[in-house]
């Protein structure tokens, strides 16, 4: 999972890859809340990172916050769960119909 994220800092200045111990704690929470497989998680993570690659990772969450992030009201949310749902629903991020052909 961690290796899918770029081995550099994001434009926000934070490392894209977080410490393994922090990720382990976040995944414990994730698996207690959601019923996804590691295969779903890897596919969803690759989809997420690939979406941001062309934008030089601008506004992308780091590996910890992608699993779970707590808002100011102490509510935990998971963008990873959203992307796992998209994988389960067969959603792709390829938007070829919006790309312009240049000849």
Task: Label every model-predicted segment.
Residues 1-103:
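Append "and, occasionally, other polyanion-binding protein interfaces
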């Amino acid at each position: 999972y961690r290796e899918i994220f770029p081995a550099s800092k994001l434009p926000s200045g934070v490392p894209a890859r977080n410490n393994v111990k922090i990720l382990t704690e976040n995944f414990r929470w994730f698996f207690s809340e959601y019923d996804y497989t590691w295969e779903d998680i890897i596919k969803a993570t690759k989809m997420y990172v690939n979406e941001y690659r062309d934008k030089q990772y601008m506004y992308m969450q780091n590996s910890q916050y992608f699993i779970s992030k707590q808002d100011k009201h102490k509510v935990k949310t998971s963008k990873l769960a959203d992307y796992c749902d998209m994988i389960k629903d067969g959603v792709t991020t390829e938007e070829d119909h919006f790309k312009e052909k240049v000849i």
